[in-house]
A protein has these predicted regions:
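Helicase P-loop NTPase motor core
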Residues: 1-74, 97-101, 133, 158
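Short, surface-exposed, polar/charged, turn-prone segments marking secondary-structure boundaries
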Residues: 7-11, 80-83, 103-106
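Proline- and acidic/polar-enriched loop/turn elements at helix boundaries
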Residues: 9, 52-53, 79-80, 143, ...
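Pocket-edge positions in alpha/beta enzyme catalytic cores
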Residues: 10, 21-25, 81-84, 156, ...
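Conserved helicase C-terminal RecA-like lobe
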Residues: 47, 61-73, 86, 93-214
Length: 214
């Protein structure tokens, strides 16, 4: 290649020497980091607040966060958001909660218009009123409104809700034969979630896609 040879040096030769650890996997790497942190704290050489872990992309934090949480090591993400608190991750988790429990109205409310489906606030207010009057979940209320000939919803609203209902029922059926991982992939692709992010064509959207692939 055309890369120039480099010789790295420092004027400050005090302190610990750099240690290179070649991990077998991402999880092995995260465990090594956690082991080193616990060793430093146990030896009273450092406090947790003295330790920093640098990584190249936000998506790389997931496995490290999991290991730190499992070890009971408290941490703070600087200049970013914890993996499971990122919008795209919360969206997919809400989809999965809804798929495994269609009567989870809270999760349904989060994903009903994600990606954008053109389901407006007025439409959802009517669906919520139906759910309250019938004493049922939002999903059952949507089904009732779509199938009712006396629905107060506009034909357009019934159409977009019907499309959502079709997608939701397909995903609910798929859960019988799919692992959670495969189902999550189907959610991202089948609902158009990834396609919407790709259409944004921004650095932020690319980062979100990378997080989802993680």
């Amino acid at each position: 290649s055309g890369r120039k040879e480099k010789k790295l040096w420092t004027e400050c030769d005090a302190g610990e020497k750099i240690v290179v650890y070649q991990a077998e996997s991402e999880r092995d790497e995260a465990r090594y980091i956690a082991d080193e942190i616990q060793s430093l704290v146990a030896s009273k050489k450092d406090r947790l607040g003295d330790v920093a872990v640098l990584y190249r992309t936000n998506a790389q934090s997931r496995i490290l966060e999991e290991v730190l949480l499992n070890r009971g090591i408290s941490y703070k993400i600087v200049g970013g958001v914890r993996f499971y608190e990122r919008k795209e991750i919360k969206d997919v988790l809400a989809y999965l909660r809804f798929i495994y429990n269609p009567d989870d109205s809270s999760s349904l409310s989060r994903i009903i218009n994600v990606p954008r489906r053109g389901i407006g606030e007025l439409t959802m207010n009517k669906v919520e009123a139906t759910a309250a009057s019938m004493g049922v979940s939002l999903f059952k209320a949507i089904k009732a409104e779509v199938e009712s000939e006396d629905s107060l919803l506009s034909s357009r609203a019934k159409k977009v809700l019907g499309d959502f209902l079709h997608t939701a029922e397909e995903l609910i059926e798929l859960k019988k034969d799919m692992s959670v991982t495969k189902l999550a992939e189907q959610v991202m692709l089948g609902t158009g979630y990834i396609a919407e992010l790709e259409a944004e064509n921004t650095i932020e959207a690319a980062g979100r896609i990378e997080n989802l692939k993680e």
